[in-house]
Amino acid sequence: MSVIYLDNNATTQVDAEVLAAMLPYLTEFYGNPSSMHTFGGQVGKAVQQARGQVAFLLGAEESEIIFTSCGTEGNNAAIKAALAAQPEKRHIITTQVEHAAIINVCKQLEKQGYKVTYLSVDSQGQIDLLELEAALTGDTALVSTMYANNETGVVFPIEQIGLRAKDAGAIFHVDAVQAVGKVPLNLKTSSIDMLTLSGHKLHAPKGIGALYIRRGVRFRPLLVGGHQERGRRAGTENVPGMIALGKAAELAQIHLKDVKREKALRDRLEQGLLSAIPNTEVNGHPTSRLSNTTNIGFKYIEGEAILLSLNKYGICASSGSACTSGSLESSHVLRAMGLPYTILHGSIRFSLSRYTTEAEIDKVLQLMPPIVERLRAISPFSNDQADWLQGREEALAH
């Protein structure tokens, strides 16, 4: 059975060119880039080339890029560095819909005496800039938000957030793990101070990422030891991963033109599902959204049941973040949006890539209506019960 992979916000297929670029650094050019001999030196040059490729994709300088192991490390490093640089400030602002790699760090910091403001979002997943303005104080060290939500694809007004953070004297960090390679970036003209990315979300292997640190932003390293990454991230370099990320960044720049094609396929999927299946709606902002992502709610059934049914046909989708998919709780993102109980528990995410085909989308459109019809036929919730649940959603959630 062939696989139709529509879970690209969880991870992506490694591009064949990326694999070809990294393999020689596992078998042939395996020297340590910190070594003084020529064998290690040529590896060091390749690492610098990869750094330049990542910088070019971001519209940044090579010196502003450090390699990390993943998005989680980058987020931890950015948040803790911002606080270490401003020990007199004890306030952080983030949002209620962040990835666990941000929210759980903030919860840990609250236990250490920091005050954290979690900005709310509206029913379309957008923040209120007036709420941000009201939250900013002279004690605010950091504003940390995602660029685009991993579950709904909703894109935040990043530059407007950044300008407000700057006016308040706060450092602005952006978790752009879902956005890099999907939206054009030019950090030279941006208000972003630090930005996190992860290789496995843009067709590089798992275990490699990068952190952008604007020139002049004070940074205390999370990992201390050797002199690697100009003293900003200790540890022997993951050279094959760095080469892979560099090549993936180069290809991502080229494939930014595919965004229109991805959006057309995404829209075809959405429109087909909405027209064929009643009591169905798209979760998130109608326009300010990643071109590859759709989060759709099907009333009166459980999202997990839909995913299991799709899995029988080799179709891979998700009910939310892969980092929390083992939890039986409903999505914290959709809860924050205030969605009704019936949509909250019946929502799934499809996330496309440059490899997604029209035939794959049509296959999903063929299979979804009978799957939903069958699940609704055996669902314990009638329309009347569902209406009752909507009025009781808060009680049931607890």
Swiss-Prot record:
| The protein's Enzyme Commission number | 2.8.1.7
Q: Where is the active site?
A: 323
Whether Aminoacyl-tRNA synthetase counts among this entry's keywords is no
Instruction: Kindly indicate whether the keyword Iron-sulfur belongs to this entry.
Output: yes
Provide one Gene Ontology biological process annotation. amino acid metabolic process
Q: Show the catalytic activity.
A: (sulfur carrier)-H + L-cysteine = (sulfur carrier)-SH + L-alanine
Chain positions with N6-(pyridoxal phosphate)lysine modification: 201
InterPro entries to which the protein is assigned, alphabetical: Aminotrans_V_dom, Aminotrans_V_PyrdxlP_BS, Cys_deSase_NifS_bac/arc, Cysteine_dSase, PyrdxlP-dep_Trfase, PyrdxlP-dep_Trfase_major, PyrdxlP-dep_Trfase_small
A Pfam family found in this protein is Aminotran_5
Sum up the protein's function in the record's words. Catalyzes the removal of elemental sulfur atoms from cysteine to produce alanine. Seems to participate in the biosynthesis of the nitrogenase metalloclusters by providing the inorganic sulfur required for the Fe-S core formation.
Family matches, as PANTHER family: CYSTEINE DESULFURASE (PTHR11601:SF34), CYSTEINE DESULFURYLASE FAMILY MEMBER (PTHR11601)
Would you tell me the protein name for this molecule? Cysteine desulfurase 2
